[in-house]
Amino acid sequence: MPLNRGHGMSKHLRSARHKALIAALKAARESAGITQRELARRLDRAHSFVGKIESGERQLNVLEFCEYADTLGADGAELLRTVLRARG
């Protein structure tokens, strides 16, 4: 079955799980004592990359998620468990 690219994406950007992911990533960054700008530098990305993720404007693919978590020194599996516990 083909993927329905783009259709319904905005629904996912407002889902409880996406909000839980944003909150978990932001909490991990703040716990690490890293600013958005510093995280972007460490990821070799534009500052807007982190800002758009934390504002809910952009989703991460799985590889970006792993890189993000690793850069923060966070346990990616635990972050995912937090997201999976969210409903909706």
Regions found by a protein language model. Give the residues of each.
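Short, basic-rich loop-to-helix N-cap that marks the start of a DNA-contacting helix
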Residues: 57-69
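Short, charged recognition helix plus adjacent turn
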Residues: 1-11, 70, 78-88
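Recognition helix of helix-turn-helix/homeodomain-like DNA-binding domains
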Residues: 43-60
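A short, Lys/Arg-rich alpha-helix, primarily the initiator
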Residues: 2-31
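Short basic helix-loop element that most often maps to the first helix and adjoining turn
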Residues: 23-42, 67
